[in-house]
Protein backbone atom coordinates (compact mmCIF):
# COMPACT_ATOMS: atom_id res chain seq x y z
CA UNK A 1 0.00 0.00 0.00
CA UNK A 2 1.24 3.44 -0.96
CA UNK A 3 2.14 5.79 1.87
CA UNK A 4 0.57 9.21 1.35
CA UNK A 5 2.83 12.12 0.52
CA UNK A 6 3.16 14.99 2.98
CA UNK A 7 3.17 17.70 0.31
CA UNK A 8 0.43 18.63 -2.14
CA UNK A 9 1.17 16.28 -5.04
CA UNK A 10 1.27 12.50 -4.77
CA UNK A 11 3.81 10.62 -6.85
CA UNK A 12 3.42 7.14 -8.31
CA UNK A 13 -0.34 6.94 -7.70
CA UNK A 14 -2.39 4.16 -9.32
CA UNK A 15 -5.69 3.10 -7.69
CA UNK A 16 -5.78 -0.07 -9.80
CA UNK A 17 -2.56 -1.29 -8.16
CA UNK A 18 -2.97 -2.01 -4.41
CA UNK A 19 0.72 -1.28 -3.87
CA UNK A 20 0.34 2.20 -5.36
CA UNK A 21 -2.99 3.09 -3.75
CA UNK A 22 -3.84 4.43 -0.29
CA UNK A 23 -7.49 3.59 0.52
CA UNK A 24 -7.41 5.66 3.72
CA UNK A 25 -6.49 8.77 1.74
CA UNK A 26 -9.10 7.95 -0.91
CA UNK A 27 -11.97 7.68 1.57
CA UNK A 28 -10.75 10.70 3.52
CA UNK A 29 -10.79 12.66 0.28
CA UNK A 30 -14.32 11.47 -0.43
CA UNK A 31 -15.75 12.50 2.95
CA UNK A 32 -14.03 15.88 3.14
CA UNK A 33 -14.96 16.73 -0.44
CA UNK A 34 -18.54 15.58 0.15
CA UNK A 35 -18.79 17.79 3.26
CA UNK A 36 -17.66 20.75 1.18
CA UNK A 37 -19.96 19.81 -1.71
CA UNK A 38 -22.90 19.82 0.69
CA UNK A 39 -21.94 23.36 1.71
CA UNK A 40 -21.80 24.24 -1.98
CA UNK A 41 -25.38 23.05 -2.52
CA UNK A 42 -26.47 24.93 0.61
CA UNK A 43 -25.00 28.14 -0.79
CA UNK A 44 -26.45 27.49 -4.24
CA UNK A 45 -30.00 27.19 -2.88
CA UNK A 46 -29.98 29.63 0.03
CA UNK A 47 -31.55 32.26 -2.24
CA UNK A 48 -34.59 30.02 -2.80
CA UNK A 49 -35.12 29.97 0.97
CA UNK A 50 -34.69 33.73 1.36
CA UNK A 51 -36.85 35.10 -1.46
CA UNK A 52 -40.19 34.05 0.01
CA UNK A 53 -39.45 36.18 3.09
CA UNK A 54 -38.14 39.32 1.36
CA UNK A 55 -41.53 40.93 0.48
CA UNK A 56 -42.76 40.42 4.04
CA UNK A 57 -39.82 42.31 5.60
CA UNK A 58 -40.16 45.39 3.41
CA UNK A 59 -38.50 44.61 0.06
CA UNK A 60 -40.74 45.86 -2.75
CA UNK A 61 -40.33 43.11 -5.33
CA UNK A 62 -42.74 41.82 -7.97
CA UNK A 63 -43.38 38.13 -8.57
CA UNK A 64 -41.27 38.29 -11.74
CA UNK A 65 -38.39 39.88 -9.83
CA UNK A 66 -38.57 37.14 -7.19
CA UNK A 67 -38.43 34.42 -9.84
CA UNK A 68 -35.42 36.12 -11.42
CA UNK A 69 -33.66 35.99 -8.05
CA UNK A 70 -34.16 32.21 -7.97
CA UNK A 71 -33.07 32.03 -11.62
CA UNK A 72 -29.67 33.69 -11.26
CA UNK A 73 -27.98 30.94 -9.18
CA UNK A 74 -28.93 28.49 -11.91
CA UNK A 75 -27.53 30.71 -14.65
CA UNK A 76 -24.25 30.96 -12.76
CA UNK A 77 -24.22 27.32 -11.66
CA UNK A 78 -24.55 25.94 -15.17
CA UNK A 79 -21.95 28.30 -16.62
CA UNK A 80 -19.46 27.76 -13.81
CA UNK A 81 -19.83 23.98 -14.03
CA UNK A 82 -18.39 24.17 -17.53
CA UNK A 83 -15.38 26.03 -16.11
CA UNK A 84 -14.98 23.80 -13.04
CA UNK A 85 -14.97 20.70 -15.28
CA UNK A 86 -11.50 21.67 -16.50
CA UNK A 87 -9.99 22.70 -13.14
CA UNK A 88 -9.18 19.37 -11.39
CA UNK A 89 -6.11 18.47 -13.46
CA UNK A 90 -4.93 22.09 -13.40
CA UNK A 91 -5.28 22.90 -9.70
CA UNK A 92 -5.31 19.45 -8.12
CA UNK A 93 -7.79 18.29 -5.49
CA UNK A 94 -6.23 20.07 -2.52
CA UNK A 95 -6.16 23.55 -4.03
CA UNK A 96 -9.42 23.08 -5.94
CA UNK A 97 -11.53 22.13 -2.92
CA UNK A 98 -9.86 24.59 -0.52
CA UNK A 99 -10.12 27.69 -2.69
CA UNK A 100 -13.52 26.77 -4.14
CA UNK A 101 -14.92 26.43 -0.63
CA UNK A 102 -13.50 29.80 0.43
CA UNK A 103 -15.26 31.42 -2.55
CA UNK A 104 -18.58 30.54 -0.89
CA UNK A 105 -17.87 33.26 1.67
CA UNK A 106 -18.56 35.95 -0.95
CA UNK A 107 -22.29 35.23 -1.46
CA UNK A 108 -22.86 34.11 2.13
CA UNK A 109 -21.46 37.31 3.63
CA UNK A 110 -22.95 39.47 0.89
CA UNK A 111 -26.49 38.18 1.42
CA UNK A 112 -26.09 38.40 5.20
CA UNK A 113 -25.57 42.15 4.98
CA UNK A 114 -27.90 42.83 2.02
CA UNK A 115 -31.06 41.43 3.64
CA UNK A 116 -30.66 43.80 6.59
CA UNK A 117 -31.30 46.84 4.39
CA UNK A 118 -34.59 46.97 2.49
CA UNK A 119 -33.09 49.74 0.38
CA UNK A 120 -30.55 47.35 -1.16
CA UNK A 121 -30.79 47.93 -4.95
CA UNK A 122 -32.35 45.12 -6.95
CA UNK A 123 -29.26 44.83 -9.14
CA UNK A 124 -27.19 44.08 -6.03
CA UNK A 125 -29.61 41.31 -5.08
CA UNK A 126 -29.35 39.91 -8.62
CA UNK A 127 -25.56 40.00 -8.44
CA UNK A 128 -25.53 38.24 -5.07
CA UNK A 129 -27.97 35.64 -6.41
CA UNK A 130 -25.63 35.06 -9.34
CA UNK A 131 -22.66 34.68 -6.98
CA UNK A 132 -24.58 32.06 -4.99
CA UNK A 133 -24.29 29.98 -8.16
CA UNK A 134 -20.59 29.52 -7.36
CA UNK A 135 -21.79 26.66 -5.18
CA UNK A 136 -23.51 25.09 -8.17
CA UNK A 137 -20.32 25.10 -10.22
CA UNK A 138 -18.35 23.02 -7.75
CA UNK A 139 -20.08 19.73 -8.59
CA UNK A 140 -18.38 19.38 -11.98
CA UNK A 141 -14.96 19.85 -10.39
CA UNK A 142 -15.38 17.81 -7.23
CA UNK A 143 -16.81 14.69 -8.88
CA UNK A 144 -13.98 14.02 -11.36
CA UNK A 145 -11.45 15.14 -8.75
CA UNK A 146 -12.68 12.49 -6.32
CA UNK A 147 -12.75 9.83 -9.05
CA UNK A 148 -8.95 10.09 -9.38
CA UNK A 149 -8.59 8.49 -5.95
CA UNK A 150 -10.61 5.30 -6.49
CA UNK A 151 -10.25 2.17 -8.61
CA UNK A 152 -12.94 1.72 -11.22
CA UNK A 153 -14.67 -0.98 -9.17
CA UNK A 154 -15.34 1.59 -6.41
CA UNK A 155 -15.91 4.73 -8.45
CA UNK A 156 -19.64 4.14 -8.80
CA UNK A 157 -20.08 3.72 -5.06
CA UNK A 158 -17.84 6.67 -4.19
CA UNK A 159 -19.36 9.11 -6.67
CA UNK A 160 -22.88 7.94 -5.88
CA UNK A 161 -22.30 8.72 -2.21
CA UNK A 162 -20.79 12.10 -3.01
CA UNK A 163 -23.55 13.18 -5.38
CA UNK A 164 -26.35 11.80 -3.24
CA UNK A 165 -25.16 13.30 0.05
CA UNK A 166 -24.22 16.59 -1.61
CA UNK A 167 -27.77 16.97 -2.96
CA UNK A 168 -29.06 16.90 0.61
CA UNK A 169 -27.62 20.40 0.95
CA UNK A 170 -30.71 21.70 -0.86
CA UNK A 171 -33.17 20.27 1.66
CA UNK A 172 -30.88 21.16 4.58
CA UNK A 173 -30.86 24.88 3.78
CA UNK A 174 -34.60 24.99 3.09
CA UNK A 175 -35.34 23.07 6.31
CA UNK A 176 -32.95 24.97 8.58
CA UNK A 177 -33.67 28.50 7.31
CA UNK A 178 -37.15 29.05 8.81
CA UNK A 179 -35.89 27.84 12.20
CA UNK A 180 -32.57 29.64 12.28
CA UNK A 181 -33.97 33.05 11.29
CA UNK A 182 -36.35 32.95 14.25
CA UNK A 183 -33.89 33.98 16.97
CA UNK A 184 -30.81 36.15 17.53
CA UNK A 185 -28.18 33.53 16.75
CA UNK A 186 -25.32 36.01 16.99
CA UNK A 187 -26.97 38.45 19.40
CA UNK A 188 -26.54 41.97 18.08
CA UNK A 189 -23.02 41.27 16.82
CA UNK A 190 -23.98 40.88 13.15
CA UNK A 191 -27.06 43.08 13.02
CA UNK A 192 -30.50 43.47 14.53
CA UNK A 193 -33.80 41.87 13.53
CA UNK A 194 -36.13 42.75 10.66
CA UNK A 195 -39.87 43.12 11.11
CA UNK A 196 -41.66 40.21 9.46
CA UNK A 197 -45.32 40.82 8.60
CA UNK A 198 -46.94 37.55 7.50
CA UNK A 199 -50.34 39.27 7.27
CA UNK A 200 -51.70 42.77 7.97
CA UNK A 201 -51.73 43.60 11.66
CA UNK A 202 -49.42 40.72 12.60
CA UNK A 203 -45.67 41.19 12.91
CA UNK A 204 -42.70 39.54 14.56
CA UNK A 205 -38.91 39.94 14.56
CA UNK A 206 -36.77 37.69 12.35
CA UNK A 207 -33.06 37.63 11.60
CA UNK A 208 -32.75 36.86 7.87
CA UNK A 209 -28.98 37.32 8.03
CA UNK A 210 -28.75 34.11 10.07
CA UNK A 211 -29.73 32.14 6.94
CA UNK A 212 -26.28 32.82 5.46
CA UNK A 213 -24.05 33.84 8.36
CA UNK A 214 -24.75 30.51 10.09
CA UNK A 215 -22.84 28.62 7.39
CA UNK A 216 -19.69 30.76 7.49
CA UNK A 217 -18.02 28.77 10.33
CA UNK A 218 -18.72 25.51 8.49
CA UNK A 219 -17.22 26.93 5.28
CA UNK A 220 -14.06 27.95 7.15
CA UNK A 221 -13.89 24.49 8.73
CA UNK A 222 -14.35 22.80 5.35
CA UNK A 223 -11.59 24.87 3.77
CA UNK A 224 -9.25 24.11 6.68
CA UNK A 225 -9.94 20.37 6.48
CA UNK A 226 -9.33 20.41 2.73
CA UNK A 227 -6.03 22.25 3.04
CA UNK A 228 -4.71 20.09 5.89
CA UNK A 229 -5.88 16.62 4.86
CA UNK A 230 -6.31 16.55 1.08
CA UNK A 231 -3.65 15.77 -1.50
CA UNK A 232 -3.57 16.01 -5.30
CA UNK A 233 -3.08 13.39 -8.01
CA UNK A 234 -1.14 14.50 -11.12
CA UNK A 235 -3.40 13.98 -14.15
CA UNK A 236 -2.52 14.56 -17.78
CA UNK A 237 -5.06 16.96 -19.25
CA UNK A 238 -5.81 16.65 -22.96
CA UNK A 239 -8.74 18.97 -23.52
CA UNK A 240 -8.69 18.67 -27.31
CA UNK A 241 -9.54 14.96 -27.09
CA UNK A 242 -12.60 15.72 -25.00
CA UNK A 243 -14.23 17.89 -27.64
CA UNK A 244 -15.06 14.92 -29.85
CA UNK A 245 -17.98 14.14 -27.52
CA UNK A 246 -19.90 16.98 -29.18
CA UNK A 247 -19.85 15.14 -32.52
CA UNK A 248 -21.67 12.17 -30.98
CA UNK A 249 -25.46 12.40 -31.08
CA UNK A 250 -25.70 10.41 -27.86
CA UNK A 251 -24.05 13.29 -26.00
CA UNK A 252 -27.00 15.47 -26.93
CA UNK A 253 -29.58 12.78 -26.23
CA UNK A 254 -28.16 12.16 -22.75
CA UNK A 255 -28.01 15.92 -22.19
CA UNK A 256 -31.73 16.13 -22.89
CA UNK A 257 -32.45 13.17 -20.60
CA UNK A 258 -30.41 14.67 -17.78
CA UNK A 259 -32.21 18.00 -18.15
CA UNK A 260 -35.43 16.02 -17.70
CA UNK A 261 -34.12 14.43 -14.50
CA UNK A 262 -31.59 16.66 -12.73
CA UNK A 263 -32.88 19.76 -14.50
CA UNK A 264 -36.31 19.07 -13.01
CA UNK A 265 -34.83 18.35 -9.58
CA UNK A 266 -32.71 21.49 -9.51
CA UNK A 267 -35.33 23.68 -11.17
CA UNK A 268 -38.22 22.71 -8.93
CA UNK A 269 -35.98 22.86 -5.85
CA UNK A 270 -35.41 26.53 -6.67
CA UNK A 271 -39.02 27.50 -7.38
CA UNK A 272 -41.06 25.19 -5.12
CA UNK A 273 -41.24 27.76 -2.27
CA UNK A 274 -42.38 30.47 -4.69
CA UNK A 275 -44.91 28.16 -6.34
CA UNK A 276 -46.50 27.49 -2.95
CA UNK A 277 -46.56 31.21 -2.19
CA UNK A 278 -48.01 32.24 -5.54
CA UNK A 279 -50.58 29.46 -5.94
CA UNK A 280 -51.83 29.12 -2.36
CA UNK A 281 -50.68 32.32 -0.65
CA UNK A 282 -53.93 34.16 -1.42
CA UNK A 283 -56.01 32.09 1.00
CA UNK A 284 -56.68 32.91 4.64
CA UNK A 285 -54.32 30.83 6.76
CA UNK A 286 -52.01 30.26 3.78
CA UNK A 287 -49.23 27.72 4.38
CA UNK A 288 -45.67 28.82 5.10
CA UNK A 289 -43.76 27.77 1.93
CA UNK A 290 -40.60 26.90 3.85
CA UNK A 291 -42.44 24.39 6.03
CA UNK A 292 -42.97 22.23 2.94
CA UNK A 293 -40.39 23.25 0.34
CA UNK A 294 -37.52 21.23 1.86
CA UNK A 295 -39.50 18.00 1.42
CA UNK A 296 -39.07 18.11 -2.36
CA UNK A 297 -35.26 18.02 -2.54
CA UNK A 298 -35.21 15.63 0.43
CA UNK A 299 -37.41 13.12 -1.40
CA UNK A 300 -35.45 13.59 -4.63
CA UNK A 301 -32.10 13.06 -2.92
CA UNK A 302 -33.31 9.91 -1.15
CA UNK A 303 -34.73 8.57 -4.41
CA UNK A 304 -31.36 9.10 -6.11
CA UNK A 305 -29.58 7.08 -3.43
CA UNK A 306 -32.15 4.26 -3.58
CA UNK A 307 -32.36 4.12 -7.37
CA UNK A 308 -28.60 3.70 -7.86
CA UNK A 309 -28.41 0.01 -6.89
CA UNK A 310 -31.71 -0.67 -8.68
CA UNK A 311 -30.26 0.79 -11.88
CA UNK A 312 -27.20 -1.43 -11.46
CA UNK A 313 -29.44 -4.51 -11.33
CA UNK A 314 -32.10 -3.65 -13.92
CA UNK A 315 -30.13 -1.39 -16.24
CA UNK A 316 -30.21 2.37 -16.47
CA UNK A 317 -32.44 2.65 -19.55
CA UNK A 318 -35.45 0.80 -18.10
CA UNK A 319 -35.25 2.81 -14.87
CA UNK A 320 -35.07 6.04 -16.89
CA UNK A 321 -38.24 4.92 -18.72
CA UNK A 322 -40.00 4.56 -15.39
CA UNK A 323 -38.65 7.96 -14.37
CA UNK A 324 -39.95 9.64 -17.53
CA UNK A 325 -43.42 8.12 -17.19
CA UNK A 326 -43.52 9.04 -13.51
CA UNK A 327 -42.48 12.66 -14.05
CA UNK A 328 -44.98 13.05 -16.90
CA UNK A 329 -47.92 11.69 -14.90
CA UNK A 330 -46.90 13.64 -11.79
CA UNK A 331 -46.79 16.89 -13.77
CA UNK A 332 -50.25 16.08 -15.13
CA UNK A 333 -51.48 15.55 -11.57
CA UNK A 334 -50.04 18.91 -10.48
CA UNK A 335 -52.12 20.72 -13.11
CA UNK A 336 -55.28 19.65 -11.29
CA UNK A 337 -54.24 21.81 -8.33
CA UNK A 338 -52.60 24.89 -9.88
CA UNK A 339 -55.87 26.88 -9.94
CA UNK A 340 -57.20 26.06 -6.47
CA UNK A 341 -60.52 27.20 -5.08
CA UNK A 342 -59.64 26.42 -1.46
CA UNK A 343 -56.79 25.35 0.80
CA UNK A 344 -58.28 21.85 0.84
CA UNK A 345 -56.45 21.22 -2.44
CA UNK A 346 -53.04 22.12 -1.02
CA UNK A 347 -52.14 18.65 0.38
CA UNK A 348 -52.62 17.01 -3.02
CA UNK A 349 -50.61 19.77 -4.68
CA UNK A 350 -47.71 18.97 -2.34
CA UNK A 351 -48.09 15.22 -2.94
CA UNK A 352 -48.02 15.71 -6.72
CA UNK A 353 -44.94 17.92 -6.49
CA UNK A 354 -43.19 15.38 -4.26
CA UNK A 355 -43.88 12.72 -6.88
CA UNK A 356 -42.09 14.88 -9.45
CA UNK A 357 -39.13 15.15 -7.10
CA UNK A 358 -39.18 11.40 -6.46
CA UNK A 359 -39.16 10.38 -10.12
CA UNK A 360 -36.59 13.03 -11.05
CA UNK A 361 -34.34 11.65 -8.30
CA UNK A 362 -34.78 8.15 -9.70
CA UNK A 363 -33.77 9.44 -13.13
CA UNK A 364 -30.74 11.24 -11.71
CA UNK A 365 -29.33 7.88 -10.67
CA UNK A 366 -30.32 5.90 -13.77
CA UNK A 367 -28.94 8.40 -16.29
CA UNK A 368 -25.59 8.38 -14.45
CA UNK A 369 -25.65 4.60 -14.88
CA UNK A 370 -26.37 4.91 -18.61
CA UNK A 371 -23.55 7.26 -19.59
CA UNK A 372 -20.58 4.97 -18.73
CA UNK A 373 -22.40 2.19 -20.61
CA UNK A 374 -22.96 4.29 -23.74
CA UNK A 375 -19.55 5.98 -23.99
CA UNK A 376 -15.99 4.63 -23.75
CA UNK A 377 -14.09 5.53 -20.55
CA UNK A 378 -12.16 8.38 -22.20
CA UNK A 379 -15.39 10.11 -23.24
CA UNK A 380 -17.69 9.16 -20.35
CA UNK A 381 -16.13 11.60 -17.89
CA UNK A 382 -16.46 14.49 -20.32
CA UNK A 383 -20.07 13.63 -21.12
CA UNK A 384 -20.97 13.41 -17.43
CA UNK A 385 -19.33 16.79 -16.80
CA UNK A 386 -21.07 18.39 -19.77
CA UNK A 387 -24.55 17.03 -19.02
CA UNK A 388 -24.20 18.01 -15.35
CA UNK A 389 -23.28 21.54 -16.40
CA UNK A 390 -26.21 21.99 -18.79
CA UNK A 391 -28.74 20.46 -16.38
CA UNK A 392 -27.54 22.87 -13.69
CA UNK A 393 -29.27 25.60 -15.69
CA UNK A 394 -32.50 24.05 -14.36
CA UNK A 395 -33.13 26.79 -11.75
CA UNK A 396 -32.62 29.46 -14.41
CA UNK A 397 -34.82 27.82 -17.03
CA UNK A 398 -37.61 26.83 -14.65
CA UNK A 399 -37.65 30.19 -12.87
CA UNK A 400 -37.77 32.30 -16.03
CA UNK A 401 -40.33 30.06 -17.76
CA UNK A 402 -42.54 29.96 -14.66
CA UNK A 403 -42.33 33.75 -14.33
CA UNK A 404 -43.19 34.25 -18.01
CA UNK A 405 -46.11 31.82 -17.84
CA UNK A 406 -47.50 33.45 -14.72
CA UNK A 407 -47.21 36.89 -16.28
CA UNK A 408 -48.78 35.80 -19.58
CA UNK A 409 -51.57 33.56 -18.31
CA UNK A 410 -52.04 34.49 -14.66
CA UNK A 411 -51.11 31.00 -13.51
CA UNK A 412 -48.73 28.08 -13.89
CA UNK A 413 -50.84 25.40 -15.59
CA UNK A 414 -49.40 26.12 -19.04
CA UNK A 415 -45.89 25.88 -17.56
CA UNK A 416 -46.55 22.29 -16.51
CA UNK A 417 -48.18 21.43 -19.85
CA UNK A 418 -45.02 22.60 -21.61
CA UNK A 419 -42.90 20.43 -19.35
CA UNK A 420 -45.11 17.43 -20.11
CA UNK A 421 -44.36 17.81 -23.83
CA UNK A 422 -40.63 17.82 -23.03
CA UNK A 423 -40.97 14.78 -20.77
CA UNK A 424 -42.89 12.85 -23.45
CA UNK A 425 -40.20 13.68 -26.01
CA UNK A 426 -37.50 12.34 -23.70
CA UNK A 427 -39.52 9.21 -22.99
CA UNK A 428 -39.45 8.51 -26.73
CA UNK A 429 -35.72 9.28 -27.06
CA UNK A 430 -34.79 6.94 -24.23
CA UNK A 431 -37.07 4.17 -25.48
CA UNK A 432 -35.90 4.40 -29.10
CA UNK A 433 -32.15 4.61 -28.53
CA UNK A 434 -31.61 2.74 -25.26
CA UNK A 435 -34.57 0.79 -23.84
CA UNK A 436 -36.38 -1.02 -26.68
CA UNK A 437 -35.45 -4.40 -28.06
CA UNK A 438 -32.84 -3.87 -30.75
CA UNK A 439 -31.96 -0.40 -29.49
CA UNK A 440 -28.82 1.25 -30.88
CA UNK A 441 -27.14 1.47 -27.45
CA UNK A 442 -28.90 -0.88 -25.02
CA UNK A 443 -27.93 0.06 -21.48
Curated annotation (Swiss-Prot):
Catalysed reactions, semicolon-separated: nitrate(in) + nitrite(out) = nitrate(out) + nitrite(in)
GO terms for MF: antiporter activity; nitrate transmembrane transporter activity; nitrite transmembrane transporter activity
CDD domains according to UniProt: MFS_NRT2_like
GO biological-process terms attached to the record: nitrate assimilation
Membrane topology of this protein: Multi-pass membrane protein
Main location: membrane
Subcellular location: Cell membrane
Family to which the UniProt record says this protein belongs: Belongs to the major facilitator superfamily. Nitrate/nitrite porter (TC 2.A.1.8) family.
Annotated protein name in UniProt: Probable nitrate/nitrite antiporter NarK2
Organism: Thermus thermophilus
